[in-house]
Amino acid sequence: MKVFFTLLFVWLLGSTALWGQPADVVWNSQSRNSSGSMPCGGGDIGMNVWVEDDDVFFYLCRSGSFDENNTLLKQGRFRIRLTPNPFAGKSDFRQTLHLKDGYVSVTTPMGQMHIWADVFHPVVHVEVETKEVTSMRVSYESWRTADRVMSREEGLQCSYAGEWPGTVVTAHDSILVGEENLTFFHRNASHTVVDAVIKQQGLESEASHLYNPLRNLIFGGRIAGDLIFSGTRRGHYCETEYEAWTYKSRKPANRQSFRITLHVVQTPVVSDWEAGLEKTEKELHAAKDKEASRR
């Protein structure tokens, strides 16, 4: 009898745990644009994922990525296109946010794509598996290819919101095109909103003693996988101009993947930021990292 009640207690405990888990979020159609995006993240990484015109998109951001105006910037927009496309014209399309394991999947009977963030490393993984042999094209899209004057309305996102100085500029990003990978980063301009506040408060004489978390801040990342550079293009998305750098898979395959490694650090030397990025890349073990992130 004691064994019976013990087993009953264990069963009830397990059932309660399952009942307490929220249901996955499932969409059965593609989105019109980025306003129909699904959140995804892990650790200090956040993404907005959606499928539009059979392409998979996501915005990407990491905590601490504040520019010279104290605006939390997105790292960029990423577009993934498969040929032949397993998501094109499929009535049984599913996009799912798997809440327990923390990833987004896009599936049809012809294939699937998983997008997930490593909980223990600042890395995003994209994994594709298709029934047919497929070619993959990955594009990094940026709207910060030149210094950009911020409008007064946009200023609400930064620390100048209360004391608008008249002209506020978001500095451009840097893009380093490699044959097999793409490196992108934002290096804060020498003059930051912290410097403006120090001047506004009449504290110039104490400036050397005040901590400025925005000075010499560099943040960005690198796209890498079994990819080769394909070319660039320009376009518009949501009334905003952008430039795209595209990489394609070396050869068609049923299984493909790539990763985006991120890094943020305060340093006046870009090579120090690159060294930190490469250190993270060397520490990665995708299979083990996936298992650890979903425990």
Regions found by a protein language model. Name each.
Residues 3-15:
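Sec-dependent N-terminal signal peptides
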Residues 16-20:
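Sec/Tat signal peptide C-region and signal peptidase I cleavage site
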Residues 21-295:
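Aromatic-residue-lined binding/catalytic grooves and analogous aromatic/hydrophobic interfacial grooves
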